[in-house]
Amino acid sequence: MTATDTAVRGNDLVDELLGWLEEHWDPDLTVGEWWERLGLAGWAAPMLPEDCYGRGLSRGDALRVSATISRFGALGAPMGMSIGLASPTITTHGTREQIDRLVPPAVTGKIAYCQLFSEPGAGSDLAGLATRAVRDGDVWRIDGQKVWTSGGQYADRGMLLARTNPDAPKHQGITWFAIDMHQPGVDIRPLKEMTGHAMFNEVFLTDAEVLDADRIGDVNNGWAVANTTLLHERSGMGARGGGAGPETAYLTRMARGGSVAGDLDKRAGDFVTARPTTATKERSKQPSSPAQGHIDLAREMGVLDQPVIRQEIVRAHILGTVARLNTERSKASPVPGIANLGKLLMGHIVRHNRDLGMAILGARGTLHAYDDEQRGEMAKLPGGKGAVAATAQALGAQALPIYGGTDQIQRNIIGERVLGLPKEPGDLTTLPFNQLPKNA
């Protein structure tokens, strides 16, 4: 397929979506009502297969859908793991009954998922997890601890990895479950970060229960299922392109999915600032720079004419474009390691964008808003909301090279699985889990 063919197909997709938005977007709908329209039409999770509540689109086209919805002035799909991680994992490894039962509430925002993978003793070495699942008839009983659980305090279900056979090698005795987070045996404790937010949580599981009907994939084959989840996580990170402009340009604040956050019954139009107009529709078709957020911020701060700032903005545009093109390249045929390379690149991009944002803000960058009241006050200062976002990005930039698999893990995967380099010495992958050496 040529670049011209891709562009034509992209324009056709945008035209179809804009026509649908003109007919169906209504800011007076509740968030839940709007997301149900969006999800059941396949626009909320367009990468899912057409028979699984999606449209079978590539990641590049899915990003185009997201940007078009935002620039049109409508509320986008539910953010988070329900659409990006849980749904594609379930559609890949689940039964037809599980797909029809679990995917619709996820893509329509009725329930929110979190990821119960990492543990205090199993982060980079995820297969070393110790959380146990013991079968009791049609129920599995879960005991263990998880940590760095993003959005756990808002989750209805968790993507749980638990050890179901400690006598097997560590990669072979793991099973993937969709666990109900609303039960007495699940204790969620938020972890406040230096940004002022509590994105992460630690989760204690004490005789918690999960039905065997909510087991995704075969017993003890959870590592293969988890690799699907991780592939989508890393691919999603690598496809962002570093942009901070058009995808969030019309959001006043983010709407959260699920029953806990309380956004489903709120008015959808209260989460966006733009209404559909002819000008907005035409703007939806125009390509935008991955560095658009920094361009707008530099203009607001009066430094757009400074040569060094302009040079680094161009660098941000180039890096973001390369990330997008890597995603486009992977559409033609599977590229080994492309998700890992993409995540490595995104780690570099967020750190570059952190430094660029601080260079644009100058002394203004020393001020950060730690709560909603402070954010409202600081949005009135030079730089506005863009400055508030830039300081938050600066404090959070180092997280991406760590979560979802550290940069070092990505390089190991590329070296061993793509380049065929020897594995690290001391490989213990064939030993049964209960014979592995452990800290006292």
Give the label of every model feature segment.
Residues 109-117, 161:
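A short, Trp-centered hydrophobic/proline-enriched beta-strand micro-motif
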Residues 189-323, 400, 439-440:
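Glycine-rich beta->alpha junctions and the first turn(s) of the following alpha-helix
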Residues 57, 125-127, 151-155, 170-173, ...:
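Short glycine/proline-enriched turns and hinge-like loops at secondary-structure junctions
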Residues 40-110, 150-157, 320, 324-342, ...:
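Internal helix-loop-helix
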Residues 143-191, 199-204, 223-227:
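A short core secondary-structure module
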Residues 1-80, 101, 105, 281, ...:
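Amphipathic, small/basic residue-rich leader segments at the start of a protein or domain
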Residues 131-134:
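A structural signal for short hydrophobic beta-strand segments in well-ordered beta-sheet cores
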Residues 9, 55, 340, 344-440:
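Alpha-helix capping/hinge segments and adjacent helical runs
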